[in-house]
Regions:
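Exported/extracytosolic protein signature
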Residues: 1-282
Length: 282
């Protein structure tokens, strides 16, 4: 809500006198808010945004344009954008009723045009955006993006929403077999590679564990973790009868990822890595 002041001046006979100061307020007819779900992001994740418009006036607000800057920030000589609109996801509501989808310019910036907010009513835009490689994945990473509503006599109301980089570990595991063709009674080796793409290390308190059922079962197995020999039952358990192999919860630890920003503005993630190797005869 903006306020204004005004003072009159009276001139007479070479003299000048000022009036009292009067103060008024300009009550904004349109209120704009913006929310994001979820509030934490990772590169490649989908964020749902909700733009909520409230018209407190007695006349409908028509022909509005809603512009989202997609979190763009200056990098080098240009701009980079940590968000990308997901085509076809917008839903437009007036007083809670679903309307035909507005015209969309994916941008950046992202624009929705032809929006109407009923008199004394509400409108909402719900849409999704993908987190791009320009989003900082670091522990202090933030995406701040602003929506601006223009049209008619509106001055350009804005609303800003911030989401923060997820602080959780993000693990992936891959499994490799060597050799792919093995002779009867030959030796097989399974290599499990565990990668952490998150900014937080996985330590013993996280109780991470790997479980597998080897078929065919392995006999006389040997196990190493990051090149260090492991022994049962402290580090793992294994049943040669069933082929069920399990590491002891907490023995799997994986360092945090490292992050660097490239010259083009994209972030490169170097995951923390751990390697579990199990060998035996069939």
């Amino acid at each position: 809500m903006a306020s204004f002041t005004n003072v009159a001046t009276l001139s007479y006979g070479g003299n000048q006198v000022s009036s009292n100061v009067v103060t008024g307020e300009i009550r904004e007819v349109l209120t704009v808010s913006k929310t994001a779900v979820p509030a934490a992001y990772a590169v490649g994740a989908t964020i749902t945004y909700v733009i909520y418009l409230i018209n407190s006036g007695t006349a409908a607000l028509t022909g509005l344009t809603v512009t989202d800057d997609l979190g763009g920030y200056a990098f080098g000589a240009g701009m980079v954008y940590p968000l990308r609109y997901t085509d076809g996801t917008v839903r437009y509501f007036a007083n809670g009723a679903l309307q035909a989808a507005p015209d969309v310019t994916a941008g950046p910036p992202l624009r929705f045009t032809g929006i109407t907010v009923p008199a004394g009513g509400t409108a909402a835009l719900v849409y999704q955006a993908e987190v791009t490689a320009y989003a900082p994945p670091t522990a202090d990473g933030v995406i701040s993006n602003t929506v601006t509503v223009t049209g008619g006599t509106l001055a350009g109301q804005t609303a800003t929403e911030e989401i923060t980089a997820s602080q959780a570990a993000r693990l992936e595991i891959t499994k490799a077999l060597s050799p792919a063709v093995v002779a009867e009674n030959g030796q097989l080796t399974y290599t499990f590679t565990i990668r952490n793409f998150g900014p937080t290390a996985v330590d013993a308190a996280d109780d991470a564990a790997v479980t597998d059922t080897f078929s065919p079962v392995l006999n006389d197995i040997t196990v190493t973790y990051n090149g260090t020999p492991w022994a049962a039952p402290g580090d793992y358990t294994y049943s040669a009868a069933t082929g069920v192999f399990s590491t002891t919860p907490g023995r799997i630890t994986v360092p945090a990822a490292a992050y660097t920003q490239s010259t083009d503005g994209t972030w490169v993630i170097t995951p923390g890595t751990a390697t579990l190797v199990v060998s035996g005869t069939i």
